């Protein structure tokens, strides 16, 4: 029986439990552990193999495959160590999905935008800067801008800047001057990742891709009075049937970042967009064309399951069964 490791951080997480259940149903022997419990012994005193990878009682190098539900948060060196372990397990012959490179590609919003654009995929206009002067210039150019943490999740700490007012995703309009807030953010982060705000129908799309195929999608609708569509920020979900164009860019986005499974967030533009009104020579069809906001390399499958009854964990384990 093939040994499948499942790296989790929350035993009660819906997706973690779904992966464990699906692994058993596919005939695997799932070994569940937290990467924050991992330890490695290298070199002197070890005969064969040269290194020993363990997490609790799980001998990681004995695994046939490893599904990463979550790497976990923490201090820089600790998180880096976990990614090193994943890379080293790959070198030891363990099939790791998603690969550490793919997870890092998706987790870094700036680098993900670069890779998506390089692959010819549509993304909002994006500028990364390291000074207050440059940030103010970009915000003025966009008119309506969004500042996101490069390493962020669940819609937290996203700020919208419009008419010299700044509003974070979980707060009301900030009373402090924009310059003061931006300067503080620069001091904390060292750079700012700024995107044009895309006027939209009050929703975005989360498409779930497994093995290069879009298996389902949901609309995520912002809560009343909010501009952030994340479910964790109070948004709601509904069924979404992808257009051919949306399906194609979702699948290509997963490929561009190297993910085996991913949540692809897509925004639909509207013809009435202020940004689009200022864009000369752009057709109505192009004004409403979809753009990729970001890619999640460790996505939850609960939203798709609740809306459609489609269980991404079943698809992930079926994919794994076919490659082992």
From Swiss-Prot:
Residues 275-288 have a biased composition (Basic and acidic residues). Pathway: Cofactor biosynthesis; 5,6,7,8-tetrahydrosarcinapterin biosynthesis. It is an enzyme of class 6 (ligase). Binds 2 magnesium or manganese ions per subunit. Residues 268-295 are annotated as: Disordered. Mg(2+) 2 binds at residues 294, 296. The keyword Membrane does not apply. Catalyzes the ATP or GTP-dependent addition of one L-glutamate molecule to tetrahydromethanopterin, producing tetrahydrosarcinapterin. Belongs to the RimK family. MptN subfamily. Homodimer. This is Tetrahydromethanopterin:alpha-L-glutamate ligase. It comes from Methanosarcina mazei (strain ATCC BAA-159 / DSM 3647 / Goe1 / Go1 / JCM 11833 / OCM 88). The gene is mptN.
């Amino acid at each position: 029986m093939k040994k499948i490791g499942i790296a989790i951080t929350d035993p009660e997480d819906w997706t973690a439990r779904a992966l464990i259940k699906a692994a058993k149903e596919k005939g695997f022997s799932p070994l569940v552990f937290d990467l924050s419990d991992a330890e490695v012994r290298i070199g002197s005193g070890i005969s064969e193999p040269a290194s020993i990878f363990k997490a609790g009682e799980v001998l990681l190098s004995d695994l046939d495959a490893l599904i990463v539900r979550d790497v976990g948060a923490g201090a820089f060196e600790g998180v880096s160590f976990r990614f090193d372990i994943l890379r080293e397990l790959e070198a030891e012959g363990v099939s790791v999905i998603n690969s550490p490179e793919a997870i890092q590609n998706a987790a870094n919003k700036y680098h993900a935008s670069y890779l998506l654009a390089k692959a010819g995929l549509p993304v909002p206009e994006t500028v990364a800067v390291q000074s207050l002067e440059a940030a103010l210039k970009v915000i003025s150019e966009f008119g309506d801008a969004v500042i996101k943490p490069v390493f962020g999740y669940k819609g937290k700490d996203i700020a919208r800047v419009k008419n010299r007012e700044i509003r974070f995703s979980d707060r009301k309009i900030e009373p402090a001057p924009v310059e003061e807030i931006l300067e503080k953010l620069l001091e904390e982060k060292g750079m700012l990742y700024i995107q044009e705000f895309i006027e939209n129908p009050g929703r975005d799309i989360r498409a779930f891709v497994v093995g290069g195929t879009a298996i389902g999608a949901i609309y995520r609708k912002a809560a009343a009075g909010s501009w952030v569509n994340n479910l964790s920020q109070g948004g709601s979900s509904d069924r979404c049937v992808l257009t051919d164009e949306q399906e194609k860019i979702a699948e290509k986005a997963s490929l561009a970042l190297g993910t085996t499974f991913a949540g692809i967030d897509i925004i639909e533009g509207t013809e009435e967009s202020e940004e689009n009104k200022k864009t000369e020579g752009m057709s109505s069809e192009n004004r409403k064309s979809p753009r990729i906001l970001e890619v999640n390399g460790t996505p939850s499958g609960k939203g798709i399951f609740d809306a459609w009854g489609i269980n991404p964990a079943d698809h992930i384990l079926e994919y794994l069964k076919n490659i082992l």
